[in-house]
Regions:
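Surface-exposed loop/turn motifs at beta-strand-loop junctions within extracellular Ig-like
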Residues: 63, 548-552, 696-698
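Substrate-binding cleft of carbohydrate-active enzyme catalytic domains
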Residues: 105-336
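Structured core elements
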Residues: 111, 140-142, 217-221, 260, ...
């Protein structure tokens, strides 16, 4: 079929590169030793059948994408050397199989943030190749954010002349970068080094065409009304305050520099921009962001207040809704469909708009009940760590290992079949605040994109973790040939300490079933490690080392410490009670000897939002004490801060307390998550009750939430 020529050519060209064997593409029938491609529109959309026999390979596909995916399946049946860029001598054998397949979901995507860090066109094209290999069909191109405008708009050249460039602070962690002056580059003699880049319209045309040939739709994202400081830096008149600002080099929170919703100039600008964008991107969908706007400028702006009065809008949330609906009307008039993050529902939303759900399934369910199509992404943020943070490159504060992503289900039990049908699919989101180069990007993408590909293609009843992880390890050999710098976090040993009725056990596991885990306690070197079979009973404090072996250590050596102390198993009371979102293991959390990790969602942390906290520990009998340690977390990208003051008071009767130690901890900006045991020492004395007072920072230096997280109280 002539419509399948392009996909046949893609396969033939790669096979020739890898094997040196040319596969001619012919329209006329041949009798033996051929690959036949036939269209059968009765098959499900993007579906195919693949039959491999000794004399022929037959492919019947529903459409272009179906044929493409059949050939991608054939690619994976061929030896891994198929991925070579130079000819390799090997046995190019394919097992005899019959496969019939079709995707469960229409939207199988990847979002790549190129604003926070810019990635060259060549890397985008490579990423599209890799998406096609995994049968992903939607590339969400995050082209605009505060930290950089990445697409040429001919009517507004300053968007790339100014908005695409910022002061180079790449030597600093994202959350430690300082604000930039609007005049930073005015004087060439004193101007700092620039960081940035953008895609010309010719680049965009090439990317879109390249994607289309691989069955991928490119959906551009042009953020509004917030995440637009790069545009406001170029054209200050677009804001309410009209002040010149610099393009930020790092974290901005809260986002108060947003487009003015009260002036017509803003909508003229956005319609002009979107008109050029739509000329470049033929996709049905146009993403407009719509998230994380702080409306303080709208509340002060006379034009915004006049707009609210004229349109009978009761608050700034309804003004945000007006803003999004107006852009929606414009896109609909051009035959396109608006997509936005789930904040676009605030204040009401047209039923045709697509909601990209990121704030949890309950918000997604609300969108479905309103009749909106939904893309579920809340548990697919691959900017989060995929292994223990101490052994991983810098990432966002969350934790999303391969196994967790694989078990993400789009089949929600609390949804009716009618609502379930409105789930378009899912995508992985790779935000790039901490991802500064292509190797780091590859590391975050692989192997997690394999899991994303399976959960967006396959129904839950056909998923099998053991099979998947075995296939993943085999697929890693293919990634090696492709020279992809993927993560090996699945081989990382994950230690947990369990308190079973007062008995303490060290449990070691990793994501690979039946892995050969070896461990050593205390000063024993890892070379003399013991094979792990079952949880290790402990009766005293110890350090440990553990790794996975395959003839030798296959990954980073995980280290840790278990500390025994006088408060284990003792009762703790809390004032106020910890937040319902972060309840750890309940009341016993802080005295169970089990320590939290840098993953604040690991179930071992108690959290308080904005509160000062008083903890009261009952040791059950008078005990000689001289030191109290409080385990705390600082993860400022997630709004978590160390307490700024600690106080220890002792009592023998639970009524009369005497303060014995205090400590003040300055609140400083930290770019990485940090764990610390704050040790308060005092003269040895008897006490049964210990009162620990913790002061919350309440107003962080960069704004936002002020969480206080504690995992253990240790008494000596």
């Amino acid at each position: 079929d002539i419509s399948l020529t392009a996909t046949a050519r893609l396969f033939a060209e790669q096979f020739e590169r890898a094997s040196g064997i040319k596969l001619p593409i012919k329209k006329e029938a041949v009798t033996t030793n051929y690959i036949a491609l036939v269209v059968d529109k009765s098959l499900p959309k993007e579906g195919y059948s693949l039959v491999v026999q000794p004399e022929r390979i037959s492919i019947v596909a529903a459409d272009y994408n179906g044929a493409l995916y059949a050939l991608e399946t054939l690619r994976q049946l061929l030896p891994k050397e198929f991925e070579s860029t130079t000819p390799v001598k090997t046995d190019w054998a394919v097992p005899a199989v019959t496969i019939t397949d079709a995707p469960q979901y229409a939207w199988r995507g990847l979002m790549l943030d190129v604003s926070r860090h810019f990635f060259p066109k060549e890397y985008i094209l490579k990423t599209l190749d890799r998406m096609a290999m995994l049968k992903l069909n939607t590339f969400h191109f995050h082209l605009v954010d505060n930290e950089g405008w990445r697409i040429e708009i001919k009517k507004y050249p300053k968007l790339t002349e100014i908005g695409a460039w910022r002061v180079d602070q790449e030597d600093k962690l994202w959350n430690e970068r300082t604000p930039n002056s609007a005049n930073a580059f005015t004087n060439p003699a004193t101007a700092p080094k620039k960081y940035g880049g953008f895609y010309t319209q010719e680049d965009i045309k090439e990317i879109v065409a390249y994607a289309s040939a691989r069955g991928i739709t490119v959906i551009p994202e042009i953020e509004m009304p917030a995440h637009a400081m790069s545009a406001i830096a170029a054209y200050p008149k677009l804001s309410c305050h009209k002040r010149s600002i610099g393009v930020p080099s790092g974290a901005v929170w809260p986002i108060t520099d947003i487009y003015c919703a009260g002036q017509e100039e803003t909508f003229t600008f956005l319609e002009d921009v979107l008109t050029e964008v739509m000329e470049l991107f033929p996709s049905k969908y146009i993403h407009v962001g719509g998230d994380e706007a702080t409306h303080t400028e709208w509340e002060k702006c006379l034009k915004c207040q006049a707009r609210m009065k004229d349109h009978h809008l009761k608050d700034v949330h309804q003004l945000q809704s007006y803003f999004i609906k107006r852009i929606d009307d414009f896109l609909v008039s051009k035959g396109r469909t608006l997509v936005g993050w789930d904040e676009i529902m605030d204040g009401g939303l047209a039923n045709n708009a697509v909601v990209m759900n990121w704030r949890g399934i309950e918000v997604g369910k609300k969108a479905l009940e309103q009749g909106n199509p939904v893309v579920l992404t809340s548990d697919c943020y691959i900017d989060n760590y995929q292994g223990l943070p101490d052994y991983e490159p810098q990432a966002n504060g969350g934790y999303l290992p391969l196994k967790t992503l694989y078990h993400y289900s789009l089949e929600k039990e609390n949804l009716s079949p009618a609502l379930q049908k409105n789930i378009l699919g899912t995508q992985a989101n790779l935000w790039a605040e901490h991802v500064g180069n292509t190797e780091h990007s590859e590391y975050m993408l692989f192997p997690r994109l394999l899991a994303l590909a399976e959960i967006s293609w396959t129904t839950d009843n056909l998923k099998n973790w053991d099979n998947f992880i075995n296939h993943t390890q085999t697929f890693m050999e293919r990634l090696d040939v492709m020279k992809i710098k993927y993560a090996r976090s699945i081989y990382q040993v994950l230690p947990t300490v369990e308190n079973q009725n007062g008995k303490i056990f060290l449990k070691l596991e990793c994501e690979v079933p039946n892995a050969d885990i070896r461990y050593a306690l205390g000063d024993t070197p890892i070379e003399k490690a013991t094979k792990y079979h079952q949880p290790i009973a402990l009766n005293r404090s110890t350090t440990f080392k553990a790794t996975v072996f395959s003839g030798k250590a296959t990954n980073t050596i995980t280290t840790g410490e278990v500390i025994f102390h006088n408060a284990i198993g003792k009762k703790m009371s809390y004032s106020p009670v910890y937040h319902k979102k972060y309840q750890g293991q309940g009341e016993a959390t802080l005295t169970n000897v089990v320590r939290g990790t840098k993953n604040f969602q690991d179930g071992q942390w108690l959290g308080w939002l904005g509160d000062d906290v008083t903890l009261t520990l009952d040791l059950e009998q008078a005990t000689e004490v001289s030191e109290v340690r409080i385990g705390a977390m600082d993860a400022q990208s997630s709004g978590i801060y160390f307490p700024i003051k600690f106080a220890i008071s002792l009592s023998t009767d639970g009524k009369n307390y005497r303060e014995v130690a205090t400590h003040n901890e300055p609140c400083i900006v930290r770019g990485k998550p940090s764990l610390k045991d704050f040790a308060l020492k005092f003269n040895s004395q008897e006490a049964r009750y210990i009162k620990i007072t913790l002061k919350n920072v309440k107003t962080p230096p960069k704004g936002g939430d002020a969480w206080l997280f504690i995992d253990e109280v240790l008494v000596f």
